[in-house]
A protein has these predicted regions:
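Acidic donor-binding loop at a coil-to-helix junction in glycosyltransferase catalytic cores
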Residues: 184-191
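Conserved donor NDP-sugar-binding/catalytic core segment of glycosyltransferases
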Residues: 95-132
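Short, well-formed alpha-helical segments that are part of the catalytic scaffolds
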Residues: 12-25
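Short beta-strand/loop segment that forms part of the nucleotide-sugar
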Residues: 30-40, 57-59
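Active-site-adjacent helix/loop segment of glycosyltransferases
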Residues: 202, 208-253
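Glycine-rich, basic loop-to-helix element that forms the pyrophosphate-binding segment
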Residues: 60-77
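Short aromatic/hydrophobic "clamp" motif used to bind/position activated sugar donors
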Residues: 82
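A recurrent flexible, glycine/aromatic-enriched loop bordering the glycosyltransferase active site
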Residues: 148-168, 184
């Protein structure tokens, strides 16, 4: 089985450097690290020139799209398993990839194959209190394997998955034609919904952990919530009949 890690990057900082170092220490080392870098001027070519298996593809800010850019990265990948990450998500330990693969090997309650397995997000040391509570709410320590049948009890959270750190089976990804293009947000949840509609399951794997949190200003949080609402409105086939109040309203990527 082959594994690629695919990372959209924009103005990478020390967290990205730490992410790459932790990928090199994994018990299951990725075959390739595919970087989709927005704006070549921000890329430190000398700093990452000698990373085994790393390849970098540059695009402009105007070309970036949450779904489309990840689809292009998937097209470059030839692996059995693709792990999408963001450039500020740092593996907590050396077992991240190993545990995500175990998550993909699980089955749903009726024997459904798992198409998607996403990791637990832990707050960084400088994370504010409200963000810590949100992380604990959305990423508990209890594993889950979700299917379409859970919509009646879980509402919108049935489809929750996060490309901050998320593993996909390449054969199913191709069968479902990947992510939606030209989406402002939520390409991961829209894909999870499509996978469940096709009879697959989505696994939450708390043993797979990344450090990832934000200290957003009120205005930044407003824009984030606005983008979330727009993406839901643009895809009524997924979100129209789902409850988004209560626990769902607190979703944070």
């Amino acid at each position: 089985m082959t594994v690629d890690v695919l990372i959209p990057v924009y103005k990478p900082d020390r967290r990205f450097a730490r992410l790459i170092q932790m990928l090199k220490k994994q018990t299951v080392v990725p075959d390739r690290i595919i970087i989709m870098n927005t704006e070549k001027a921000y890329w430190n070519a000398d700093g990452y020139r000698d990373i085994p298996g790393m390849e970098v593809h540059h695009l402009t800010k105007e070309e970036f799209d949450h779904g489309g850019t990840r689809n292009l990265a998937a097209w470059y990948s030839e692996s059995d398993i693709m792990i999408f990450m963001t450039d500020d998500a740092v593996p907590q330990d050396e077992y991240l990839i190993e545990n995500l693969l175990k998550g993909l090997d699980q089955k749903g309650p009726d024997g459904e194959a798992v198409a998607v397995a996403y990791a637990r997000q832990l707050p960084a040391k400088d994370c504010r209190t409200i963000e810590r509570y949100t992380r604990a709410f959305n990423y508990p320590d209890t594993p889950m394997v979700k299917t379409k049948k859970d919509v009646s009890t879980m509402g919108i959270k049935t489809y929750f998955a996060s490309n901050v750190c998320c593993a996909y089976r390449k054969d199913i990804f191709r069968k479902l034609e990947g992510f939606v293009n030209s989406t402002i947000f939520n390409e991961d949840m829209i894909y999870a919904a499509a996978a469940m509609d096709a009879g697959y399951a989505v696994a939450y794997v708390p043993e797979a952990k990344v450090v990832h949190s934000h200290n957003l200003t009120p205005m930044q949080q407003f824009h984030r919530n606005f983008d979330l609402a727009v993406s839901q409105a643009e895809h009524p086939e997924v979100f129209a009949d789902l409850k988004s109040e209560g626990e769902g309203i607190r979703l944070v990527k």
